[in-house]
């Protein structure tokens, strides 16, 4: 009986995509390393792909992707999956040392069966996984669990179709379960890993533990001709013709054993067959300087090389502005405008200036680099910027969105150099309320390049720094005064200010880490934040007032379930959000007492994941139910229930905990309860800031959405009489509610009534467009653009994904660096604070160095000399000693063990289960809670997760 073929149509499409020319069947067979027995299947599949319109057959029996033109000189490069492909039907072959873009399988748009769900597969390093649905599904409160045996040939990150085999059960532990039935597109066209030499064949072990397939490297694919040329160029010792060659040879395969390599996947796993790939880059050895950064760049598929055409265009565009360009702009060069940035910043994209009027009113100018003048729409430079989406900042280097000729050159607002800008000119009353604003194109000459450190010293009356910048000292004091007023007005409207520090690594001259510290956020940082927030707000208000479709930075109201979970945790510390009827809603939801009619009305409620994945603090439980239908109704009610939560509830709690020992942990938990901010074509408002209108306008050098806003703004200023597209869903939704009503819908009515006479929203301040004449802006094609709603939605989705990708890469490399730093301190003891508790242990944040690590459950058991367990109802770890009795969890129908150890953590009467009568044993049980101080010892580094693990030190 013949063996089943491992041939996959996706493999053929991918091969044709990365090929520099059309390929014959024999070339495809050799490239995919097919068996002779697969030849008939190959021809049959080529015929099917041709019939479906996926490929074209050329003369001579050669094939290529439909709609593609052969461009031998074209090249793709390292980039995120499916972003470039979504923009162009033409696929280019990869450059050397680059991650090719995957091909989307034809079945993507197939209709789904009733029990099928389309989503993204997220695998766990233990083998199982979850499918995160593309769209919230009312019947599913969460993700779909996929057992190891049901993953089939899918890989982590793949876009898949899952067939639901079991619906969610009576508790959160029994979520919906399914299996993978189709793979729509592959997330990884390349994989970075360790090269392992073998006598018969070589393999690459992926660095991402969630990629659970070894990559087989067939003979001849370890060192391709292109890679050999690159090795020779890098080190003449490998050139057989060089007189300096040590051995006049290419290194043997065994010499590559243990090297870090980047592998292009030629054949994905199919019917149990191992995936096959070829080495396209040799990055170095683990532990070598900079190799960890290179690994993270490729692991997260960050575009890491600019194509030659993009670099050439950037050099061509990076010319000093001509007199004709300057003549058509408003001239601000006579004003003492300054930039304020970090110590190591080189891309200065914002500059500010403040005036105090004689009547006490304020005039604020925010000038932003006019990147749209240099990066024109639909050019190679623009396409590359869109692919990248954002600049990525690592501790030791950056991966910029734009080439250096622009980002650190002509677009950077360097001191004493003429620079083109887009300007927001804002008038405020003496109390910091916006009265009017005007947007214009301009030219500035920065008077000084300031740093946050020096501005802060000036504001603290440092005599040396104040003398150095004497001409600007008074202006900085005005900036501080205005910034405090703006912050006060923002606070009145419910803006939440989480002061959570970030990790900052200090290096010596040899790039060795010397410390990991908390970032400082001084008054200089805050004044720039306030000015940028104000500028972003007035730009969005202007575009909304004009009815022009735009990108918005939105932050939606948190889900009811997340609010309830946080409320439960806050009560353990004696705090509450103070939401009316929240406790009654919680009890009703937990016990399934919400009326069926109300539950039915709420089934359309939109569920959402939390802002950064699953919270480390654990989640609130849904009460058990003996009736599946009733429980399903209860779960839907929880996902879609409305809770009257406002930013003021969070803000009031932030004020209560400021300066308290529990501030760090509760601020972290509050942040986790909120949704993740994103880009959208609809003006949904920004919950955390308390704004109805908000966009990103102030960082076009490093964020693609800001560049889009600049183009839209230019179009709006060039066309002051253009009527809004009222048939646009975005515009229609905005115009459906008056501005004042929109504003009031987000704030307490009583509070707004007292402020109405003196406060107006930015949107209300545009009674007439205040813009220069149409001829005042350059008329070059591609500089001013009006986008359609469809285009904006695509860009919003891509930009949000790019932002999350960049954040994940930055976070992971920081974890790697932290692990490397702590390797030097293994065995040392530290004071720490428990900031999160899960079933497998507690996460501890150290006080001396800003490092977070895991205190495993085994460490508690070793310290207590008894078995320890995670107690879910109050998120604690409890030692199951002789003082344990039995109780029934008030939120569950199952028996639990509970502690009779008296609580010293404030009033926990609402959380602690009642004691079991007079028969309770003495309180001999130990427990650990969120916020508890602990003494730990750096014990080991988890080699898979690159995570520090601690041991508990007894006092």
Question: Residues of each region from the PLM?
Answer:
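Compositionally biased, low-complexity intrinsically disordered regions
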Residues: 98, 732-735
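Electropositive polyanion-binding surfaces
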Residues: 210, 257, 262, 267-271, ...
């Amino acid at each position: 009986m013949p063996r089943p073929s491992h041939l996959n149509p996706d493999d053929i499409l991918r091969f044709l995509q990365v090929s520099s020319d059309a390929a014959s069947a024999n070339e495809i067979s050799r490239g995919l390393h097919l068996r002779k027995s697969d030849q008939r299947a190959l021809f049959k599949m080529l015929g099917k792909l041709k019939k479906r319109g996926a490929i074209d057959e050329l003369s001579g029996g050669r094939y290529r992707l439909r709609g593609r033109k052969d461009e031998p000189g074209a090249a793709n490069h390292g980039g995120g999956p499916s972003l470039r492909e979504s923009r162009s039907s033409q696929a280019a072959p990869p450059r050397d040392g680059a991650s090719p873009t995957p091909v989307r399988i034809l079945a993507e748009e197939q209709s789904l069966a009733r029990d099928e769900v389309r989503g993204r597969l997220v695998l766990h390093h233990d083998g199982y996984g979850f499918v995160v649905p593309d769209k919230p599904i009312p019947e599913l409160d969460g993700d779909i669990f996929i057992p190891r045996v049901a993953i089939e040939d899918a890989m982590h990150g793949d876009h898949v179709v899952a067939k639901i085999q079991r619906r969610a059960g009576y508790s959160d532990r029994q979520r919906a379960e399914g299996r993978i039935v189709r793979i729509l597109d592959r997330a990884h066209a390349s994989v970075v890993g360790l090269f392992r030499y073998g006598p018969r064949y070589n393999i690459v072990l992926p660095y991402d533990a969630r990629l659970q397939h070894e990559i087989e490297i067939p003979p001849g694919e370890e060192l391709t001709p292109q890679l050999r040329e690159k090795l020779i160029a890098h080190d003449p010792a490998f050139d057989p013709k060089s007189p300096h060659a040590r051995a006049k040879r290419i290194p043997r395969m065994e010499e590559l054993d243990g090297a870090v390599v980047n592998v292009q996947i030629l054949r994905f796993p199919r019917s149990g067959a191992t995936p096959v790939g070829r080495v396209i880059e040799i990055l170095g050895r683990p532990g070598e300087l900079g190799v960890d950064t290179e690994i993270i760049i490729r692991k997260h598929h960050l575009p890491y090389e600019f194509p030659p055409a993009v670099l050439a265009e950037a050099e061509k565009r990076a010319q000093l502005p001509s007199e004709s360009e300057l003549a058509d702009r408003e001239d601000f060069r006579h004003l003492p405008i300054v930039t304020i940035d970090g110590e190591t910043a080189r891309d200065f994209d914002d500059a500010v200036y403040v005036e105090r009027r004689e009547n006490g009113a304020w005039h604020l100018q925010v000038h932003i680099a006019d990147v749209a003048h240099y990066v024109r729409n639909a050019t190679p430079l623009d396409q590359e910027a869109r692919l990248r989406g954002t600049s990525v900042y690592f501790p030791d280097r950056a991966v910029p969105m734009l080439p250096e000729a622009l980002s650190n050159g002509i677009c950077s607002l360097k001191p004493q150099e003429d620079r083109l800008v887009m300007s927001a000119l804002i008038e405020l009353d003496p109390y910091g309320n916006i009265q009017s604003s005007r947007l214009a194109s301009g030219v500035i000459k920065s008077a000084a390049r300031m740093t946050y450190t020096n501005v802060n010293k000036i504001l603290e009356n440092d005599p040396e720094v104040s003398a150095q910048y004497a001409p600007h000292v008074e202006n900085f004091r005005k900036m501080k005064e205005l910034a405090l007023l703006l912050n006060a007005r923002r606070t009145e409207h419910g803006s939440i200010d989480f002061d959570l520090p970030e990790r900052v690594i200090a290096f010596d001259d040899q790039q060795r880490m010397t410390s990991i510290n908390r970032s400082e956020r001084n008054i200089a940082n805050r004044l720039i934040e306030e000015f940028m927030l104000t500028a972003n707000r007035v730009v969005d208000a202007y575009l909304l007032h004009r009815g022009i479709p735009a990108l918005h930075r939105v932050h939606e109201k948190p889900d009811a379930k997340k609010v309830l979970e946080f409320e439960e945790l806050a009560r353990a510390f004696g705090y509450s959000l103070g939401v009316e009827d929240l406790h009654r809603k919680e009890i009703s939801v937990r016990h399934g007492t919400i009326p069926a009619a109300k539950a039915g009305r709420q089934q359309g409620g939109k569920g959402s994941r939390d802002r950064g994945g699953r919270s480390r603090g654990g989640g609130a439980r849904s009460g058990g139910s003996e009736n599946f239908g009733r429980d399903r109704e209860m779960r839907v009610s929880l996902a879609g229930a409305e809770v009257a939560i406002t930013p003021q509830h969070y803000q009031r709690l932030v004020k209560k905990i400021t300066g308290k020992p529990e501030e760090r942990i509760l601020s972290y938990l509050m942040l986790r309860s909120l949704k993740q901010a994103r880009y959208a074509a609809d003006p949904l408002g920004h919950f955390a800031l308390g704004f109805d209108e908000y966009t990103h306008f102030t960082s076009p050098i490093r964020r693609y959405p800001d560049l889009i806003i600049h183009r839209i703004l230019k179009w709006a200023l060039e066309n002051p009489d253009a009527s809004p597209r009222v048939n646009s869903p975005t515009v229609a939704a905005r115009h459906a509610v008056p501005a004042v009503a929109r504003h009031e819908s987000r704030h307490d009515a009583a509070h707004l009534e007292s402020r109405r006479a003196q406060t107006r929203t930015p949107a209300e301040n545009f009674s007439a467009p205040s813009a220069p004449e149409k001829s005042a802006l350059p008329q070059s094609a591609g500089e001013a653009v009006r986008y359609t709603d469809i285009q904006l939605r695509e860009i919003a989705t891509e930009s949000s994904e790019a932002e999350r990708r960049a954040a994940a890469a930055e976070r992971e490399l920081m974890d790697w660096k932290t692990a490397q730093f702590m390797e030097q301190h293994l065995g040392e003891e530290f004071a720490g604070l428990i900031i999160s508790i899960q079933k497998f242990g507690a996460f501890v944040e150290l006080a001396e160095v800003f490092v977070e690590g895991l205190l495993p459950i085994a460490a508690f058991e070793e310290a207590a000399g008894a078995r320890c367990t995670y107690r879910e109802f109050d998120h604690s770890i409890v030692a199951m000693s002789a003082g344990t009795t039995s109780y029934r969890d008030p939120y569950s129908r199952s028996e639990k063990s509970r502690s009779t150890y008296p609580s010293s953590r404030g009033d926990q009467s609402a959380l602690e289960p009642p004691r079991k009568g007079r028969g309770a044993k003495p309180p001999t049980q130990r427990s650990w809670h969120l916020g508890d101080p602990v003494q730990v010892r750096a014990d080991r580094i988890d080699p898979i997760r690159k995570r520090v693990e601690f041991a508990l030190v007894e006092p």
